[in-house]
């Protein structure tokens, strides 16, 4: 007598599709003649196993040049640094607040070499640095040099210009040239032949020197104008062809081109006891000689490397 077989699953929760059930089960007949079903075991790898995941291989560095290897190393360091600083906004803010202030060179086209320059209110800087003026922000000395505060951090390779003091320091802190006091110690301070007065360090406006030269003599003395023959050479030729010639020599009663006359400081223009005095570079041209006071000198760049001493008797 034939009997029919019924395939029954013992796990009711796993029954979904009858076709899947028949596909994943098999008939097992034991020694006692009982028939039972067993589910097929999956021999595949587990989806979360580490062995199944392929490890990312690093690119081979063999055959690359030294320059490429160094460049790649720098790029990797930058990537690691960028990844370490992402999300750390507090540290970035603290770094930006305590940023190092470095000397910023001024445009040499605006500030002439060898001339004390004023940039803004009560900001006077020492001239004569080859590529422009040295400017550091925190504190400005009243005598034309800059002074950095104690909280400012600077690189060890950059010099630290301190406050200029004629009585305590005998060298210029910007160009490190030895200074010397000429005549009256309270009036003229010189460095390598060039001199300037402590009381007259306000330069003419930056929008043009020729307009300043056309002002009256009293106004020039009150503003503390310091004449430099190099500025005269760089000025426009049209200034000498105007109706009021600023290059009029009081001693010889002659007028001449801007290269023929220089000037020197005498006395203290603040109280009206002195000012700019002119003299000729070529006194024999007009048949008269102009005496020059020995203790004063023509003002040239205080820190300029190519300083010309014009304090000789002509």
Swiss-Prot record:
GO terms for cellular component: nucleus. It comes from Arabidopsis thaliana (Mouse-ear cress). Induction: Up-regulated by the transcription factor AGAMOUS. Regulated by ATXR3/SDG2 via chromatin methylation. Triggered by TGA9 and TGA10 in anthers. It comes from the Eukaryota. Expressed in flower buds. Not found in leaves, siliques and stems. Detected in rosette leaves, stem tissue and seedlings. Pfam families: NOZZLE (PF08744). Changing residue 310 to A: Loss of interaction with TPL and loss of repression activity. It is found in: Nucleus. This is Protein SPOROCYTELESS. GO terms for biological process: anther development; sporocyte differentiation. Keywords: Nucleus, Repressor, Transcription, Transcription regulation. GO terms for molecular function: DNA-binding transcription factor activity. Its main location: nucleus. Belongs to the NOZZLE family. A motif (EAR) lies at residues 308-314. The gene is SPL. The keyword Transcription applies. A motif (SPL) lies at residues 62-70. Contains 1 EAR motif required for the interaction with TPL and TPRs. InterPro entries: NOZZLE, SPEAR. The keyword Transcription regulation applies. Transcriptional regulator of sporocyte development. Acts as an adapter-like transcriptional repressor recruiting TPL/TPR corepressors to inhibit TCP transcription factors. Required for nucellus and embryo sac development. Plays a central role in patterning both the proximal-distal and the adaxial-abaxial axes during ovule development. Involved in establishing the prospective chalaza of the ovule and in controlling the cell number and the length of the funiculus, and is required for the development of the integuments. Required, with BEL1, for cytokinin-induced PIN1 expression in ovules. Homodimer and heterodimer with SPEARs. Interacts in vitro with YAB1, YAB3 and YAB4. Interacts (via EAR motif) with TPL, TPR1, TPR2, TPR3 and TPR4. Interacts with SPEAR1, SPEAR2, SPEAR3, SPEAR4, TCP1, TCP6, TCP8, TCP9, TCP11, TCP15, TCP20, TCP21 and TCP23. Interacts with TCP2, TCP3, TCP4, TCP5, TCP10, TCP13, TCP17 and TCP24. Disruption phenotype: Complete male and female sterility. Changing residue 314 to A: Loss of interaction with TPL and loss of repression activity. Residues 1-20, 33-62 are annotated as: Disordered.
């Amino acid at each position: 007598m034939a009997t029919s077989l019924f395939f029954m699953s013992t796990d009711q929760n796993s029954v979904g599709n009858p076709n899947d059930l028949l596909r994943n089960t098999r008939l097992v007949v034991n020694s006692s003649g009982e028939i039972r079903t067993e589910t097929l075991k999956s021999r595949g790898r587990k989806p979360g196993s580490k062995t199944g995941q392929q490890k990312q291989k690093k690119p081979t560095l063999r055959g690359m040049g030294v320059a490429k290897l160094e460049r790649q190393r720098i790029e990797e360091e930058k990537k690691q640094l960028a990844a370490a600083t992402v999300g750390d906004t507090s540290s970035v803010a603290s770094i930006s607040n305590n940023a190092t202030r470095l000397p910023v060179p001024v445009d040499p086209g605006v500030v002439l070499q060898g001339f004390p320059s004023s940039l803004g209110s009560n900001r006077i800087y020492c001239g004569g640095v080859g590529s422009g003026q040295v400017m550091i922000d925190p504190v400005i000395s009243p005598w034309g040099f800059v002074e950095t505060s104690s909280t400012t951090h600077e690189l060890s390779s950059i010099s630290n210009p301190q406050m200029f003091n004629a009585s305590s320091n005998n060298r210029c802190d910007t160009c490190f040239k030895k200074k010397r006091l000429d005549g009256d110690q309270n009036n003229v301070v010189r460095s390598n032949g060039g001199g300037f007065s402590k009381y007259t360090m306000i330069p003419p406006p930056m929008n043009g020197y020729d307009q300043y030269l056309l002002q009256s003599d009293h106004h020039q003395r009150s503003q503390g104008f310091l004449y430099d023959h190099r500025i005269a050479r760089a000025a426009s030729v049209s200034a000498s062809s105007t109706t009021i010639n600023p290059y009029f020599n009081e001693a010889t009663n002659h007028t001449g081109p801007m290269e023929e006359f220089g000037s020197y400081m005498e006395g203290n223009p603040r109280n009206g006891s002195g000012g700019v005095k002119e003299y000729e570079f070529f006194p024999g041209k007009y048949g008269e000689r102009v005496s020059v006071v020995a203790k004063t000198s023509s003002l040239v760049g205080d820190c300029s490397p190519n300083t010309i001493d014009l304090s000789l008797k002509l």
